[in-house]
């Protein structure tokens, strides 16, 4: 199993500086990770640094809350793609979802996907804030949205992905939508387990430690 090819090497801290992005990129090149995942203001910078690499750039939008108006999400996605991102990780509108306004949530996702062309969209449903029935419903919405991935977590709630999250999500989406497990992965054994349960991508800021088979004490 080529673990590196499952990993989105992630740096989403608001205080991240150019030297931190440089370090992220150097690590991604060294381990040949599938992608880096960064905030949208760094996409153009990272694209220049990765111009001779096949490592993908994933940009988060309206992160970490997902509570902005749809037009703002659409505009940020368009700009991130124009700057060099080929993948977008968006947060669904959790408040609207909790209100039962599923049509709004669906249209919010569809509107972003509509301006992305063939680029990949991952939808973060923030499983830590949902019960089992809500996880199922959120996955069903993502299924109908045209997005390529459903993703567990932002890393900013009280926990990241759990094995039970992935089991519920996989049972709901089958092979129709891919799954990204993010946060909460503390060792290589846990990483492998998430993949075995059905995750096609892993989001973590501790990618290097995981590749070196170290135990993660803190971090996303």
UniProtKB/Swiss-Prot annotation:
<keyword id="KW-0456">Lyase</keyword>
<dbReference type="InterPro" id="IPR013785">
    <property type="entry name" value="Aldolase_TIM"/>
</dbReference>
<dbReference type="GO" id="GO:0016052">
    <property type="term" value="P:carbohydrate catabolic process"/>
</dbReference>
<dbReference type="InterPro" id="IPR002915">
    <property type="entry name" value="DeoC/FbaB/LacD_aldolase"/>
</dbReference>
<feature type="active site" description="Proton donor/acceptor">
    <location>
        <position position="180"/>
    </location>
</feature>
<keyword id="KW-0704">Schiff base</keyword>
<feature type="active site" description="Proton donor/acceptor">
    <location>
        <position position="89"/>
    </location>
</feature>
<dbReference type="GO" id="GO:0006018">
    <property type="term" value="P:2-deoxyribose 1-phosphate catabolic process"/>
</dbReference>
<dbReference type="InterPro" id="IPR028581">
    <property type="entry name" value="DeoC_typeI"/>
</dbReference>
<dbReference type="GO" id="GO:0005737">
    <property type="term" value="C:cytoplasm"/>
</dbReference>
<keyword id="KW-0963">Cytoplasm</keyword>
<comment type="similarity">
    <text>Belongs to the DeoC/FbaB aldolase family. DeoC type 1 subfamily.</text>
</comment>
<feature type="active site" description="Schiff-base intermediate with acetaldehyde">
    <location>
        <position position="151"/>
    </location>
</feature>
<dbReference type="InterPro" id="IPR011343">
    <property type="entry name" value="DeoC"/>
</dbReference>
<dbReference type="GO" id="GO:0009264">
    <property type="term" value="P:deoxyribonucleotide catabolic process"/>
</dbReference>
<protein>
    <recommendedName>
        <fullName>Deoxyribose-phosphate aldolase</fullName>
        <ecNumber>4.1.2.4</ecNumber>
    </recommendedName>
</protein>
<comment type="pathway">
    <text>Carbohydrate degradation; 2-deoxy-D-ribose 1-phosphate degradation; D-glyceraldehyde 3-phosphate and acetaldehyde from 2-deoxy-alpha-D-ribose 1-phosphate: step 2/2.</text>
</comment>
<dbReference type="GO" id="GO:0004139">
    <property type="term" value="F:deoxyribose-phosphate aldolase activity"/>
</dbReference>
<dbReference type="Pfam" id="PF01791">
    <property type="entry name" value="DeoC"/>
</dbReference>
<comment type="function">
    <text>Catalyzes a reversible aldol reaction between acetaldehyde and D-glyceraldehyde 3-phosphate to generate 2-deoxy-D-ribose 5-phosphate.</text>
</comment>
